[in-house]
Amino acid sequence: MLDLFVPGYVKFDADNPPISGKGGLPPGFCQFRGIEVMCGPRGLPGEGDHLFRNNGDGTFTDVSEKAGVSDPKGYYGLASVFVDVDDDGWLDLLVANDSVPKYLYRNKHDGIFEDVSYLSGFALNDEGRAQASMGIAVGDYNRDGKVDFYVTNFSDDYNTLYRNEGEASFSDVSFQGGVANLTIPFLGWGTGFLDYDNDGLPDVFVANGHVYPGVDRQDWGTTWAQRPLLLRNLNGVKFEEVPPATNSGLADVVCARGAAFGDLFNDGHIDVVLNVMDGPPVLLRNVVKNSNHWLTLKLVGGPKSPRDAIGTKVFVTTGNVRQRADVFSGGSYASTSDPRVHFGLGVAEKVDKVEILWPSGAKQEVRVPAVDQILTVVEGKGIVAP
């Protein structure tokens, strides 16, 4: 059964909003680069986080304190995701917090989580500094079989690429990976790993937009509305920005927040939907044209796994290349994406092996008859008609 985690942000009273210099709130918490802005989050009381256990009868029980994830410090949570970071078969929990350290909770297999945020290296960046984190991308960008993370942050700071070193240990490789300097002018929100060109290497997409409309009246090198970023994975080590072609979706300047990913047209290309402040959603259709192949799998869990297969890991092998994808819900920011797992296969014309590790603990291999198709796989049964 699926449980529910809700990160808390601030305790806010709309009838008594925080005002600079009043109620014990220092004026500095209501300024940005010397101009008056809305107060917070620092200086405001934080809201705790909540983990609700599924009782199986349509009700939930709040087990936050018992499980060790209640956030007694009152950090400002914005995004969260369950994923198995140490590959022990149990889902761990990550939380992106605004202006304070991030959380990584390791599942102890008994309903309790251990806070390994600092021990893992995930709490802070490589400079030992907390960042104002907004969204989390989940994926194995270097194809070493371990899940990595990309975290979006506030402007005047860089987005953070965390490489999984194993045993729930992470290294900030943002500068080595080429994703640091180019992101500093942008304020990132929704994000995800996606293989936009189907070359077999997960790329990164970032939705951007500022929180202070007044930045447009200042000469700060940033703006309220911002274009998104698409970072192409070059070799599993380094990324480069895909230039925004004129009149393309990458050149569309909006104040974005959420970003959801999926093959909306079932054509083998991952598309993006942006949630925009004070405007309609924006659909970015992937129109990349090349001869690369792909494979998409819709997974259906059996009696001992969630039906939507949350927590499943899939490994696809073509030649000497082995890719990993995880089925998860959450991450990004204020968004949920297509749960189907998508693999770009590059020039490979056949799949040698598909290995599936279900949440129940069952392991299954399926034979893929051909590439460039969407297949439905049911736990214990294999490929079935859609």
Predicted features, each with a name:
Residues 147-153, 193, 197-213, 217-227, ...:
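Loop/turn-rich, solvent-exposed surfaces of beta-rich toroidal or solenoidal domains
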Residues 17-75, 106-131, 163-186, 217-254, ...:
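Blade-edge motifs of beta-propeller repeat domains
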Residues 178-181, 221-386:
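Gly/Ser/Thr/Pro-enriched helix-cap/hinge segments flanking short amphipathic alpha-helices
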Residues 13, 49-50, 101-104, 157-159, ...:
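Structural signal for beta-propeller blades
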Residues 8-22, 102:
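Short, solvent-exposed beta-strand-terminating loops
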Residues 1-2, 53, 77-87, 91, ...:
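Beta-propeller blade termini
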Residues 7, 50, 54, 139-141, ...:
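Extended catalytic-interface subdomain
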Residues 3-8, 92-97, 146-153, 204-207, ...:
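Hydrophobic beta-strand segments that make up the repeating blades of beta-propeller
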